[in-house]
Amino acid sequence: TDYWSSCSQYNTVLFRQFKDENIKINEEMANCLLTGLITDTGRFQYSNTTSEVFSIAAELLGNGANLSKISENIYGSIEFNALTLQSKIIERIVLNEDLQFAHSIVFQNDYKDYQVEPEETDFLIDVVRLVKESTVALLIKEQEDGSFKGSLRSRGDIDVQKIASIFGGGGHVAASGFSSNQSPEFILEKIEY
């Protein structure tokens, strides 16, 4: 069966494959798959949230997935240092009103200054996405090797997967990412022009 041409969500593909191969989904697997569905769909808010996603989520809950625990682990609490770094990232948000495009950046020295691990900042794209006047949000994160990773989110009909593909990245219509050895200024120029 060709799942990939009709499905952009890895966790949906895994779920279908488990079902097709009669693999019993235990509680641990259900928690992992539901975590993926929640994050892939932005808590069931992005345009890739379909009736099938809700059906799968319901079945995973029936198999023992713990929605409360998953939500608390992902969204319910933030380390104090990561929260103080969030305020710095908010200060750096730039809004291009003409393009309805908001962006911000996290530098390597931010991780050191705030004593935060890079993975503790994954939620920051959702902070940039909160800018009401934007339909596209970008968070650029400097990597240890000096390269940059970009996380893109969109509202409405903007396909951020097309933007990510400029840099060899990909993802979904509403949530995509990329890596680049170019400077943040170059990245922004390519996106804005």
Residue spans for each PLM region:
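Short alpha-helices
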Residues: T1-I56
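Hydrophobic helix-and-loop "lid/oligomerization" segment in the mid-to-C-terminal part
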Residues: G42-I166, G171-E192
